[in-house]
Amino acid sequence: IKGTNGKSQGVVPFLKVVNDTAVAVNQGGKRKGAVCSYLETWHLDIEEFLELRKNTGDDRRRAHDMNTANWIPDLFMKRVFNDQEWTLFSPNNVPDLHEKHGKEFESAYLEYERLAIAGEIEVYKTVKASDLWRKMISMLFETGHPWITFKDSCNVRSPQQHAGTIHSSNLCTEITLNTNPEEIAVCNLGSVNLVNHISESGLDQEKLKKTITTAIRMLD
């Protein structure tokens, strides 16, 4: 792209490629591949991302098999409640927002908005936060996607804040682990058969406690 002066058309065409790749792979000829994509609410492509699972529109801009989710900062919800504007940015112009959460994110985001108003950032778009939120909810009712997940809540409650920022969850939104270009998060699943922990006197809680402790250690 760089050598031919070409430009990327945003995240949607690449998500379409990932979607088709996942469908092309299956498990034992029965279970098709699965993938989930999370996008932060400040991203310039968020409005098109919301429509990925729609059954109408240009099918080249759709990913019917991909699970999608919104990764929402608290600041966006504040803007919704206060009926304020929300600014969408290209990640090229705000490279550190992805790695920030909480007060750090809010401070950086407000500074980028100031730069946009001053003309120092050219690629951006301003929308009403309530309109964008309404579209999120509408798409959720219409297609079941994208899911609603909260970036700041996940990071504030993480026991691994020292290890970096949580950028997403998994396909079932049951884990929240930090990731970076060198570190991926893995969802290991396990189950405990409660029948094996029941005696004539009822549930053997000590045995169950020992089993769960061992299982968690094995999954770690």
Question: Model regions: which residues?
Answer:
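Active-site cavity-forming subdomains of large catalytic enzyme subunits
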Residues: 1-209
